[in-house]
Structures are given as C-alpha cells and as structure tokens.
Amino acid sequence: MTHPDPTLFGHDPWWLMLAKAVAIFVFLLLTVLSAILIERKLLGRMQMRFGPNRVGPAGLLQSLADGIKLALKEGLVPAGVDKPIYLLAPVISVIPAFVAFSVIPLGGAVSVFGHRTPLQLTDLPVAVLFILAATSIGVYGIVLAGWASGSTYPLLGGLRSSAQVVSYEIAMGLSFVAVFLYAGTMSTSGIVAAQDRTWFVFLLLPSFLVYVVSMVGETNRAPFDLPEAEGELVGGFHTEYSSLKFAMFMLAEYVNMTTVSALATTMFLGGWHAPFPFNLIDGANSGWWPLLWFTAKVWTFMFLYFWLRATLPRLRYDQFMALGWKVLIPVSLLWIMVVAITRSLRQHGEGTWAAWLLTAAVVVVVALIWGLATSLRRRTVQPPPPQSTGAYPVPPLPSVGTKETADA
C-alpha cells in the first residue's frame, strides 16, 4: 500500500506542479458539467419525466450548451448597484471554491515521467483548517452580492447566507475534532493513512452524520437553500445577476458541493482506499486505481445531494436555526467528550474501550435522531388572544349615537 511521503510535497518540478493544478481545475470543471446534467436527468426520472434530451445524443451536451448560452448573453448591470463590489462578488465566491480542493488527496504516490509524486497538489499540517477557512471566505461573495445589488431580496438572501454559515460552520468544525483525536493529525494525507485498516465512518458515526447535515447546509442546497428560496426571495442573492456573473455563482455552488463531498470522503470513508471487496485485490490501492475509488465515493455524496433536492421540502428558517444550534452543536460537543474519554482509557491500557465507544455511539445517534424529530416536528400555532375594543392598536370605534350626531 502506497502512502504519500510528506517529503514529496514541495519538491516537484514546476511543470509537474502546474500540470497537477491544471488537472485539478479540469477535474472540477468536468465534475460540475456532469453533475448539472446528471442532476437534471435524475430529477426528471424521479418526477416521471425525461429531463434534458434535445442537445446532443440523449441530451449529453445540454450542460455545455447552457454554458455557451450564458457566456453569450449580455451582461446587464442594473441601475443603483455598487458596481465594483457587484462585479467582484462572483469572483470572491468562485476562487475559494477551487483553492480549497488543493489539499485534497486524490490518490497515493505515482510516477509521472520518472518523477515520483503524490496525487495531491500540496498538503499542510493544518490542511483541514485551511479547507474550512477557504470555504468560509466564499460566503463573503454571497453577502457582498446581496449588499451591492441594491435590492431587498438579494440583501435578505445575503443575510440568510451569513447566518447559515455561522450556524453550520461551527457544527462542521466540531464534527472534525473526533477525527483529529483518532488520526492524531490535521493533515489530509495523514488522516487518509490513519484509515488504512478501519474507516472512521464506522468508529465515528455521530461525527459523520453531523458532518453530512452540516455540509448540505454549508452549500445552500435543498432542503437548506434558504438564501435563494424562489418562493420567498425570487432568486436570493443572485436575483440581479445574469450572463457569466450568474454562471460563476452556479459554478461556485457545484464546486463547493464537490469539495465538501471530497472532504467527507477524506475524513470518513478512507479517502482513496479501495472499498470492500476490492481492497482484497493486490494492487487495488497502488498506481492510478485509487483515483477511481476516490471519484466513486465523491459521486456517492453528489447523488445524495440530488436525492435530497428531489425528496425534501425546504425547511422554515426557525427550524433550520433550531437544528443547527439546538441539535447539531450540542450533540457534537457530547460526542467529542465521549471520544476523548475513550481515547484516554485506551492510552491507559483499558481493553474495553471499543465497547465503550460503540455504546456511546448508539446513545449519541439516538439523541441525534430524537433531536431531529423534535426540532422538525410541526408546532401548533396558538391563536392570537382576542383584543378588547379599547386596547392598542385598535382605536375605539364611534358609537351609533356619535355617528348620528355627526351626520346631523
């Protein structure tokens, strides 16, 4: 089994680093084009219709045609916008989405024209924190787009997005703490190497569930697409955008989906390690094969995104906030304490740490399910109390005698 050697990072020739950067960029672009088409096809099938079927064979060129259409559209700038910020917001939104993918390991070490290099652009001792920071910067583009548009609906969408990121970035960060305790590192390649024998999804199931819910909220996808709710805010923060500027926001959304899916694969599903039973085959985790396993796992999460969009209705804003602050964050804190205690018992020679961890995982999962059911259940709205005639803000109505006197 070939794990990336940390000494390999930063020693590649310039042309190899450039080639890996371009390859990652092309990989993300192709993933976005494929994801848009597959999502529309799957939604069509789930809604008993065909989906895109006109452009190209079986509609396979529909995403490319949509991209060309957006590129050729006139770039309108509405009157009353803050033009510099209005034009800069899509750029701020899309660049961090690509940058965050630079520390994701796509495979082990391979040989390219005689140079041994990992299938990863670079790695850092705090690579996971770097991803969290990069994805958090992207929300500034959304907030600035809402602020600079000079319209009420985009502004409300930007405010919702900022509140959403603040709420769910905390839960997402806390879900990683248990992984750090087990792996002993924040390096993405080190976390993948720590899952050589057992994936963390089996050991840290509550952290995985919290992360899955948080990643959907982090990317503004259904049922958490409150910043761009069509029925409430028209189009949200990109209501006033068209042509390439709108395309950049859409590109950033799907690249973020790919990034958080790749991060979930890295943190919980063993990264590029082959799943069972392929891991029993000699050479399944060497060469270029890990790239196939990694891509398959990422597309599993992408399908989850599409499935949720076709299945679940949008949550109310109060339900969304209650889920983040009253369920995910407390459960994450409780689970961190459980994992820390079990790790401490294991270091002191206690042999029953696995049973403790499994029991605690069951308890935390039950608490998480109960919290979800409690926060999302339909609440009974109490009718407003009846107001007396003289109570504020209803003014006293004139009596019949007063009206007759006024008419006379």
UniProtKB/Swiss-Prot annotation:
It catalyses: a quinone + NADH + 5 H(+)(in) = a quinol + NAD(+) + 4 H(+)(out). GO terms for biological process: aerobic respiration. It is found in: Cell membrane. Its EC number is 7.1.1.-. It is a multi-pass membrane protein. Pfam families: NADHdh. One of its GO terms (molecular function) is NADH dehydrogenase activity. It is an enzyme of class 7 (translocase). PROSITE patterns: COMPLEX1_ND1_1, COMPLEX1_ND1_2. Its main location: membrane. NDH-1 is composed of 14 different subunits. Subunits NuoA, H, J, K, L, M, N constitute the membrane sector of the complex. This is NADH-quinone oxidoreductase subunit H. Belongs to the complex I subunit 1 family. InterPro entries: NADH_UbQ_OxRdtase_su1/FPO, NADH_UbQ_OxRdtase_su1_CS. The chain crosses the membrane at residues 18-38, 84-104, 124-144, 165-185, 198-218, 261-281, 288-308, 321-341, 353-373. One of its GO terms (cellular component) is plasma membrane. Residues 382-398 have a biased composition (Pro residues).
